[in-house]
């Protein structure tokens, strides 16, 4: 067993910068052996540190390379200086093809018996991933009492014009029990999601989202969305769902579009609490048409105490550059918190 303090001091004196995380490794013990002949190499190591244990087996034959690695309660949180992360137990097998010193293709699969995050231990996760030089594909499944899901995704043309596809089947998701959020108390979520994107930058990206069979259940409430479809292009956003539809046309910045929409609400409902003064912080210029027939999702999912028994219709145009807002809002009868409002148009 050797201390790394002296190594750290020498490297510092030589002005060789190490990643900050390396300094969290205080003690290290390494056992290993390597043999090779011709194009065949076998290397086995057992690494023990103050943060945990890693065992690996690397084999190279010609241009092919394989890796088997396992960890037992490796303290990744301490290694990465992340207070939310705890320990990780991992088993992984990987294989790849080399071209010179560059890996041209690689695939890996493994299981995660346990991972601690925010004082919750996730169990029974499995994954696989593959990369062929242009496309990455991967799958993840978790079978845990408080999160049961299957994810699958791919990303193609990563260096040129990325195209991604993603699907998720979430059979059970309990945010409070996972210590992620207390917003919905003991609620359980389930849904099916698929999404795709095309484009290199958010401002020029085209994307689609499909949600099916969304279910929310808690001790006091239940809510479901059978279908939700969203399509996004550089000059248009269109959303169709059980609870209504929204269509936006024109120039918009996804990061500031919320400010512009709140500006519409502030102009038409200046006394409504919870809406700050409009801040013109962008160059958004668009028209908005929306028809909302069900507001229960606003109350339950967004946590906003807004309710209307009648349809809400909005027709608006906004130009942040000229600081102009024209809006026609039909909001006959609604409540916000304990206050009742009428003729909000």
Can you name each region flagged by the protein language model?
Residues 1-345:
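Interface amphipathic segments
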């Amino acid at each position: 067993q050797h201390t790394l303090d002296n190594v750290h001091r020498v490297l510092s004196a030589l002005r060789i910068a190490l990643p900050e995380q390396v300094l969290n490794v205080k003690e290290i013990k390494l056992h290993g052996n390597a043999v090779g002949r011709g194009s065949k190499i076998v290397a086995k190591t057992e690494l023990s540190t103050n943060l945990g244990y890693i065992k690996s087996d690397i084999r190279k034959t010609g241009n092919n390379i394989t890796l088997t690695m396992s960890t037992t309660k490796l303290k990744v949180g301490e290694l990465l200086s992340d207070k939310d992360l705890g320990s990780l137990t991992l088993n992984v097998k990987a294989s790849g093809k080399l071209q010179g010193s560059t890996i041209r293709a690689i695939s890996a699969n493994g299981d995660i018996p346990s991972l601690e995050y925010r004082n919750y231990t996730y169990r029974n996760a499995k994954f696989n991933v593959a990369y062929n030089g242009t496309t990455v594909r991967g799958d993840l499944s978790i079978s845990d009492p408080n999160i049961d899901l299957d994810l699958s995704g791919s990303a193609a043309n990563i260096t040129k014009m990325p195209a991604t596809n993603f699907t998720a089947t979430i059979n059970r998701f309990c945010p409070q029990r996972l210590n992620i959020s207390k917003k919905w108390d003991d609620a359980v979520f389930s849904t099916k999601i698929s999404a795709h994107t095309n484009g290199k930058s958010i401002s020029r990206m085209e994307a689609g989202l499909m949600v099916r069979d969304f279910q929310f259940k808690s001790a006091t409430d239940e809510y479901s969305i059978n279908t939700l479809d969203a399509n996004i292009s550089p000059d248009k956003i269109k959303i169709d769902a059980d609870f209504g539809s929204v269509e936006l046309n024109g120039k918009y910045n996804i990061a500031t579009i919320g400010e512009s929409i709140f500006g519409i609400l502030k102009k038409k409902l200046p006394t409504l609490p919870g809406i700050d003064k409009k801040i013109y912080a962008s160059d958004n210029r668009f028209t908005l048409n929306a028809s909302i027939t069900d507001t229960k999702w606003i109350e339950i999912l967004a946590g906003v105490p807004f309710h209307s028994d009648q349809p809400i219709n909005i027709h608006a145009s906004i130009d942040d550059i000229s600081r102009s807002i024209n809006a026609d809002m039909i909001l006959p009868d609604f409540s916000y918190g304990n206050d009742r409002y009428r003729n909000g148009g």
